């Protein structure tokens, strides 16, 4: 009888501890969900007056303005849908361009057009691609905001028909999981697990379709905390910075490959850029 009583007491204690753990987990999950909902409500309130719209208008002016030694505009720039056709184009990038002989993302393609159509110098164009706090948006930030806005609502479909496109995606996947730096981090350290966050910022699991769609569709974005439009190239650059990796060069092959990998993961999503971020 005593043995039976002791066994029953132990089982009751285990059950109580299990119930407590489940309750704690449930409360934690509820708190996280509530936090996410609060953040989303905040974004929704701000989205009605997204300052990125002003940057988009500036980008439209730059797109139409004749510049460079050739005194030409960018209106014949081909982003994959044909010269000058912008609607839905960025939802299918990065992609292979036969005239350049390589895979390009939106930003490297814009630089290519500025060089080939306008006769401008690539080093001059890319020497300062990102604005600093309190500065006006750069030419590239403005152009990016404008061209992305023309694909808002388009379905993401990053092509994989060309061997170079497949190779770019494969390299991007390797980079995503590659661990290095003083913290032995990879992109996957933050973005390959569910329900992770840093401070109030949720970290999407980019190996899953829905989170990948939401993330890819939202960039470029107006970053409220910085008062600036930040592009997808900047997003890759800043992730490398946070991992304490060597500085990611603007328009580098590694950056394009990572964006290709994420774009393929995001297939079927709906473009929302230029969106609003914290």
Predicted regions: what they are:
Residues 17-28:
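C-terminal segment of classical bacterial N-terminal signal peptides
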Residues 2-15:
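Bacterial N-terminal signal peptides that target proteins for export
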